[in-house]
């Protein structure tokens, strides 16, 4: 049994209650850690464990509360995005950031499942879903300026906001029974609210790909950027490989900055050299319906995008949740309630497609 203990003072840690038949080796393997780490954290002298014994699986993590947080281990140096070109370099190696991100995600996942009602329906049980938060790492995506209600200039960084939406989608999908993974992960935060919304997320370059082996290289070049987009597909393909036939999906989440496109979401399906991926287009059509609003109609388009090519998921799409070129949409995405609203719409699109596949 995995437990999550968290409070602003105590920090955050993951614990495991030993069951009959468990060994230190099996516990370490299951939770992607090492026997040495577990022994050190719990001050164990031998490898013997006993049923009912509670072991700490992760070091205690310092939690930093902030208007645009919380953050874990370390928080941004700036309280908000200072200007269009502002960014903060990683303070740790890709390997360490990967390990920290994994600890956070395991804690997040355990917390979701611990709070889930036992009798809740799980219509997505048996599905494997890949969420691909756009950009991240070295690549911030779009950075646009916006004005608050008090005419104060603030800046919106695409990758930081779509990662927050991806985490909100992740949570809802897990509650519905799906197995879910992220292609890109952050080492110092989970879901974040903005209170007030003018405390915009800072462009931190610390995100990494969700791939332990890939992050062993001691180079900042392994962090997400336009030159290694194919790594997203590799992470996705590894996850969906064991899925049941027709029970895997890939959803890439973005917020584009396109002057020539009207307001509202855009769903992109895979189209290459005039040939349309029918399953991708079918999924896109269902998602477009889910995202549609009378004042901001959703659109649909076929394109040959790197994250959709050679993708082994049953159906793959890219969703531009907002077009932040428009001041109104850049204004909206700063609010966590808007991000939660769009996360639920994305989930409703996934659910609708899953029901269609029955």
Model-derived features with residue positions:
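Catalytic-site microenvironment of enzymes
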Residues: 1, 5-6, 10-19, 23-46, ...
